[in-house]
Every structure is written in C-alpha cells, then in structure tokens.
C-alpha cells in the first residue's frame, strides 16, 4: 500500500481537525454526539452507523480520503460533553487506530491517536471554565481529576491552571454512549484495556484548548502508568495556551523528549513530536506567558481607532492580571513557532490591517488561529494560502453526504466570529466591573 500524501505529523493534525467539527453545530448532547459520529464516518473506517440518518453498518472511509489521510479506524468514541445544556459541545474526544504509520526519521508503527477537540467559540463554559480560568492554580503533585481544588502556589511543585485541571477532569469523566465505538467505557478504561501488537505508538493531539489539554492528559496517564501497553507515547499539540507553570513545563519536557531515541531530526518547522507548534501571529498561544501577552494588543499593528485600541489594551492588561495573580509563572512546554502571514480578506470581505475595529481584529485572529494551520482554499479572486501544517484542508464531504441529525443546526463562520467578539467584550466588561466595585470598596 502506498503511503498517504500527508506525513505522520499532518495525519495526526488532521485528526485534531476532525474532532473539532463538533464546534460547527448546535443541539442536545445526544444530537451533537450523533452528528460528530456521522461526520467521522466519511473519513474513518468502522465508525458505528448513525441509524437515524439511514446508515446500516460500520463505515468505510471515502475513496477520496485514504490517499491523503491514510486508512484509520475509529476504535473509541466519539464522546462529547455538554456541561450546561447550552446546545453546544464543550469538550469532545475520539480514538482512532492505523495499522501502519510511517514516521519521518523513524520506523513504521501501528498507531493509536487520542484526538481532543479545540475550544468551541460558542461555548461560554469553554471560555470561562477552561481557557480563561488561569488566575488560580492546582498542584500537579496531588492532582486528582475526580476531586480537586485550587491551591496556593509554593514555587517548588509543578502546577497547572485551574482551567487545565477542569478540562482533564472533563475528558476523563466521559463515557461512550451505547451507539459509539467501545460503548460504555471511559477513555482511561479503554487505553488501559487495549492489547496492541508489538511496537505500537499512541499519540495525543489537539488544537487550541486541546493544545493545552493533550500534553497534560498524556503526562497524567503516563504518570498513572496507564500507557504501559504502548511502546511509545507521543504528543502533537498545536496553537495551545500554556497549561502550567515553569516546573510543570520542565516535567513535561523531561518526560517527553522532542526526539524519540534513535530517530532522525526532520527539517520542516512542524515536524517534531512532543512540541507545541504555534503560529506566531496567533493570539491564543500568546497566553499565558507574560512577555507574550504583552504583544497581543498590537500583534496586527496598533489600531488607528481610539476605542478599538483601548479595548485591545484592556484585553491585554486584564489577561496579564489573570496570568500573574497566583504567583505562578506560566511557561510554554517545548515549542516550535511557525511563521504566519497577515491576511487582508475573509472570503469576499476585506480585513483592515492594522485593525480599525474589533471585527477586524477577531477576523484576523480567527484566520490565524484556525485556517492558517490547515490552509485556505482559493476563493474567487483570492488565491489559495498554503497552511502551516496541512497544505490545504482535508477533502470535504460532498453535499450528498452532508446529512444533519434532526434537531441539529449548523453554525456559520460569521456566527462564530460574532460569538468570539461577544465573548471578548463580555470578558473585558466583567473585569472592568470588578475593578469598579473594588474601587468603590476602597473609597468606603
């Protein structure tokens, strides 16, 4: 069998893109889980049928997919969390398996991938309880995902943010539904029970929020000795904020070296394991190191509009306040910056650079955080843009395959942009109101 056109790094990133499709819909938890499972059936083999959409047996990946992505089987999930009955997916994860992955500079190995979903722009829970919950920290040395609370920073032990601790707890608490792959099991139970063939790898991957959760989950399960059935555990996080502080980053780096023993170093910037890859024009991975947060307001140039510039400076200032409040010094795990390029349009709409409005800023942010990693197809007079990891997005499913589970509604890109703007303004306003209340108390 010929190797797919995507290398191993790109295939793994492709899995992170697939699980992220959960953000494109609204519905109940059950409806969203079925929709994600249906979407996966175009790309993966052995996805259990979604009978409500007329499927009658396990899937076979579409013929347009395997020459690009390779032949992967769904073996667990997908599982999905909807925390507040808010009609959106807050966390999602699945596990896929391939009999033979050719690792550049390394061997050909059977491989499992744990793919974790990115931040859902429409999820207030994601923003408040996971992404932005960094002013308090949790001691990693005593962390128990089923029961934890923030603690004072002692400067000696490794610590993770409260948001990261919450996300890991959520992922480990998920149980697959009866119509999913490996029904009625948790992720930890599944990984502990797998009996892989000799010389099998497992890779944890995820983008954005999952760029913080995937290395943290891999480290937790490794320390709990849940990965012993596998000969090699790797991580491929992208666009993630910092999950923890200096001691945590050092612990991760020493546990997961960037180059497995005996493997050859690769030449392209995205080609390294156990390394967080990030676009240097992406706002999200500038969190939560203070020196990087100090760049976000003017990352796309200082706005000529007073109110826009004031809003972005407030966003930056409040982010720094939150990141430094606990006393922990947030620090990236080993990482590789990728060189982004500013974009001047989104579809047929122009984007002002520097941004004249919050809309300009968020549209640029969205492109840099999402589309620049996976490539942008040509659109009218706009030429295609080669992605930083994928040259172009994975093959799209044809309209004949795009069925929708009853009760599900789709979320447009414009709606995502509007929601991000709303979340940012709401977050700034919440901090400003807190400052006003503190000022009133001090006057009294």
Enumerate the predicted regions with their spans.
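Serine hydrolase/lipase
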Residues: 1-16, 21-22, 173-205, 219-444
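Gly/Ala-rich beta-loop-alpha elbow adjacent to hydrolase catalytic centers
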Residues: 206-210, 214
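Buried hydrophobic packing segments
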Residues: 53-55, 217-221
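A conserved cap/lid and substrate-binding interface adjacent to the catalytic center
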Residues: 71, 75-202, 225-228, 232, ...
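N-terminal low-complexity, Ser/Thr- and acidic-residue-enriched intrinsically disordered segments
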Residues: 1-109, 115-119
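A short secondary-structure junction signal
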Residues: 124-128, 214-217, 247-249
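Short, solvent-exposed loop/turn segments at secondary-structure junctions
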Residues: 119-121, 211, 242
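Short, polar loop/linker segments at the starts of domains and inter-domain junctions
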Residues: 32, 129, 294-296
